[in-house]
């Protein structure tokens, strides 16, 4: 059974990392970032729900007299 030649693996792995790094740098450099991000104020509208307008009384079963 022949031996596996691993002498070129280091070169291949290093070249792969270099290529991936270059591709990633090119993709990030073409991305448009916001220069000055600011929070936009949002208005919270108060909506009345039916259970807020009605008076309700909740009875727990354990509090009822026997």
Swiss-Prot record:
Transmembrane segments: 8-24
One GO MF term attached to the UniProt entry: proton-transporting ATP synthase activity, rotational mechanism
Modified residues (N-formylmethionine): 1
Keywords: Acetylation, ATP synthesis, CF(0), Formylation, Hydrogen ion transport, Ion transport, Membrane, Mitochondrion, Transmembrane, Transmembrane helix, Transport
Modified sites of kind N6-succinyllysine: 54
UniProt GO BP: proton motive force-driven mitochondrial ATP synthesis
Residues with N6-acetyllysine modification: 54, 57
Alphabetized InterPro entries for the sequence: ATP8_mammal (IPR039017), ATP8_metazoa (IPR001421)
Residue ranges of coiled coil: none
Localization in the cell: Mitochondrion membrane
Source domain of life: Eukaryota
One Pfam family from the record: ATP-synt_8
PANTHER family in the cross-refs: ATP SYNTHASE PROTEIN 8
Function: Subunit 8, of the mitochondrial membrane ATP synthase complex (F(1)F(0) ATP synthase or Complex V) that produces ATP from ADP in the presence of a proton gradient across the membrane which is generated by electron transport complexes of the respiratory chain. ATP synthase complex consist of a soluble F(1) head domain - the catalytic core - and a membrane F(1) domain - the membrane proton channel. These two domains are linked by a central stalk rotating inside the F(1) region and a stationary peripheral stalk.
Similarity comment text for this entry: Belongs to the ATPase protein 8 family.
Subunit organization: Component of the ATP synthase complex composed at least of ATP5F1A/subunit alpha, ATP5F1B/subunit beta, ATP5MC1/subunit c (homooctomer), MT-ATP6/subunit a, MT-ATP8/subunit 8, ATP5ME/subunit e, ATP5MF/subunit f, ATP5MG/subunit g, ATP5MK/subunit k, ATP5MJ/subunit j, ATP5F1C/subunit gamma, ATP5F1D/subunit delta, ATP5F1E/subunit epsilon, ATP5PF/subunit F6, ATP5PB/subunit b, ATP5PD/subunit d, ATP5PO/subunit OSCP.
Protein name: ATP synthase F(0) complex subunit 8
């Amino acid at each position: 059974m022949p031996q596996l030649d691993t002498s070129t693996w280091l070169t291949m792995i290093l070249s792969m990392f270099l290529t991936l790094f270059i591709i990633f740098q090119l993709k990030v450099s073409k991305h448009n970032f916001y220069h000055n991000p600011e929070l936009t104020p949002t208005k919270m509208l108060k909506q009345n729900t039916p259970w807020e307008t009605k008076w309700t009384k909740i009875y727990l079963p354990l509090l009822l007299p026997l």
